[in-house]
From Swiss-Prot:
This is Putative uncharacterized protein DDB_G0288035.
Length: 67
């Protein structure tokens, strides 16, 4: 069983919090609708930007050791 099933299934080694995983699930659902319903290209940009923000937040929230 995967410890981080969503991101590992996507081939990413990003450890997301529960909230971030939920955001990512929402983005995937919206992306699926986008691909199937042919929304305008602006929505695709918003999805990509949000995904990048989530990943950036995760990377910047990694604590640095202060020993």
């Amino acid at each position: 069983m995967l410890k981080y099933p969503l991101t590992q299934a996507m081939g990413c080694d990003i450890r997301l919090t529960n909230q971030q995983s939920q955001e990512l699930y929402k983005l995937i659902i919206v992306t699926w609708f986008y691909k199937n319903a042919k929304f305008n290209s602006g929505l695709k940009v918003i999805i990509i930007v949000r995904l990048m923000k989530i990943i950036h937040q995760k990377q910047s929230s990694i604590p640095t050791s202060t020993s």
